[in-house]
C-alpha cells in the first residue's frame, strides 16, 4: 500500500513511483506495480505473487527493480505462523525478476516506519516489524543486492505519515 500510494491525495500523481518518474525524467519509464495490502509471504493473507500487479511487473521486464514489501507481513495472520518462510519467499521473488530480465538491477528496501499511534503497533507488530527489517537485511546480504533505507529518513518525521504507516505525498 506504500508503493501503491494508499492515503495519498491524487495518488497517481503523488505516489512515490510517480515522484521517482518526475525526478528521473523521460530517460526512464517508471511503473507502479504495488498492490495495497500485499504480503511478501506466499502463505500470507494476500500474497503479492498472487496479485495481477506481480505478473504485470514480470511482463514489464524492468531493467531496474525496487522491491518494498514486508509491512503487511507484520499482520498477526502472517508473521507468527510463516516467519520462517520469509527469506526463501523473498529470494524466490528476486529470482523471478531475474528470470524475467537477467540483466535487471534490483534494490531491496528497508520498510518505512510504523509509528506507535497505529492501532496494530500495540500488538506484537512492533517486534515483528523489527524482525522483518533484520530478515530484509539478511536477504540483501545473501543475494548481494543493495539496500535502500526507507526507515531512517522518515523515522524522525511522523508528520509525514498521517495514519502512522503510509507516507503522504511529501513523505
Stretches found by the model and what they are:
Residues 67, 107-110:
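Structural beta-sheet core signal
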Residues 32-34, 110, 149-151:
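Residue-level recognition of beta-strand->loop/alpha-helix junctions
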Residues 93-97:
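Hydrophobic positions in alpha-helices of CheY-like receiver
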Residues 29-31, 105, 144-146:
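Conserved beta-strand segments of alpha/beta enzyme cores
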Residues 113-150:
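Substrate-gating cap/lid alpha-helix
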Residues 100-106:
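A short helix->loop->beta-strand "cap" motif at the edges of active sites that frequently abuts
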Residues 146, 162-171:
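Histidine-centered active-site loop/cap adjacent to the catalytic His
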Residues 2-91, 127:
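Conserved SGNH/GDSL esterase-like catalytic core that processes O-acyl groups on lipids
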